[in-house]
A protein has these predicted regions:
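Generic recognition of long tandem-repeat/solenoid scaffolds
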Residues: 46-48, 131-133, 171-176, 218-222
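Extracellular beta-rich ligand/substrate-recognition surface
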Residues: 53-59, 163-166, 175-181
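Catalytic and substrate-binding regions of extracellular carbohydrate-active enzymes
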Residues: 1-112
Length: 225
């Protein structure tokens, strides 16, 4: 429940995840800047200013500015101004979390195949050296800014309604911002099930250019469209 792909969250233990509002899990933010648009059904964007409510188990000074620019089967994900005072639990941005079947599923980390339950590694992505990950569904992630934790492990959760213990094996990757981050950032590209020819023809860094990435604006130029 902590790691929904694309979200920036404080990783809380299960007992702190329930909504403090009776009858609903929708804790609406006081921040109203959020929206999306599309062009010809092929290109689009989403942007939001994250701001937590002042509620039980929430961190009211948790803020972030997030955007996703979509060009055909590529998504450029940017984050700036990630800030909160929660020094007990870490803040993270999830790349993916997907079910993993031993003997059937594999992931790639910088071109190396990983298929063993218990795999765990921490790597960094930079402008000079992108971190490349492929999930079990042939989606490719290229991290340009961020320290990334990757793992294949058995996880325990709870059924949403009955609270019965549930278990499963998952492959996960997330960008670590640490506890109580100050002006945290991230940048990564998600290439959705690219063909071998697409990967051969273009390097991830060649497909787009970030013109601006700060608290004033997120601006991206896509070179292929």
């Amino acid at each position: 429940w902590n790691r929904l792909p694309g979200t920036t969250t404080i990783h809380l233990p299960f007992e702190l995840l329930d909504s403090p509002l009776p009858g609903t899990t929708m804790a609406h933010s006081k921040e109203n800047f959020s929206g999306s648009s599309s062009l010809e059904g092929k290109n689009g964007m989403f942007v939001t200013k994250l701001m937590e409510r002042e509620l039980k188990n929430f961190t009211p000074d948790f803020v972030a500015r997030k955007s996703v620019f979509c060009f055909e089967n590529r998504m450029i994900c940017l984050g700036t101004g990630i800030h909160n005072s929660n020094n007990e639990y870490p803040t993270e941005t999830t790349l993916f979390q997907s079910t993993f079947q031993k003997g059937k599923s594999t992931i790639l980390v910088n071109g190396e195949e990983e298929k063993e339950i218990g795999f765990k590694k921490k790597l960094s992505g930079t402008t000079e050296k992108l971190l490349s990950i492929r999930d079990g569904y042939n989606n490719h992630y290229f991290v340009k800014d961020g320290n990334v934790q990757i793992q294949i492990t058995k996880q325990e959760s709870r059924h949403e309604k009955t609270r019965a213990v549930t278990q499963g094996t998952f492959a996960s990757a997330w960008i670590e911002h640490g506890k109580a981050p100050k002006n945290g950032t991230y940048e990564y590209l998600v290439w959705i099930q690219p063909t071998d020819q697409e990967l051969k023809n273009y390097e991830a860094t060649q497909t787009y250019e970030v013109l601006q990435r700060n608290d004033s604006a997120h601006i991206v130029h896509d070179r292929l469209t």
